[in-house]
């Protein structure tokens, strides 16, 4: 009843309430797109010896109509795409690989920007401790990025991930795996 009384007293209340509902509804829809960027992780070996280096890859799929900024940007006000890893005593990330970005012009920028779109593969070299005991381990990381369309950008986001790997004794032979993915990474040029 109070709501009806307020409406009768002030005809401007209805448009304001409807406007607020629509504004909040549209805001939630645009920010709720959690599926703009998806990732999948890979390791290069089925087992790792203590003190050995192996590669990891992060396959990043960006939805059509969207892009993310490259890892190195000429515009200091944009958010770069970045792989980050949690520091620990068992592993050390020694080198990163980011693909060559595309140069594109968008409505929200005065100049061309370095961007990634579609599907890209990021990578890193990981060195294990020489003291690493045989067993299963997890490397924790995150992908930081900012998704944009042709007109504007969403708030920066991060996707946390874990990469499981197995340490084996020096006497055990290991095999390379996921070579289809790793053949697309050129660590030599980085």
Which residues make up each language-model segment?
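Bacterial N-terminal signal peptides
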Residues: 15-25
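N-terminal targeting and processing segments of secreted/endomembrane and organelle-targeted proteins
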Residues: 2-3, 26-29
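Bacterial N-terminal signal peptides that target proteins for export
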Residues: 2-17
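Extracellular/lumen-exposed scaffold segments
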Residues: 28-190
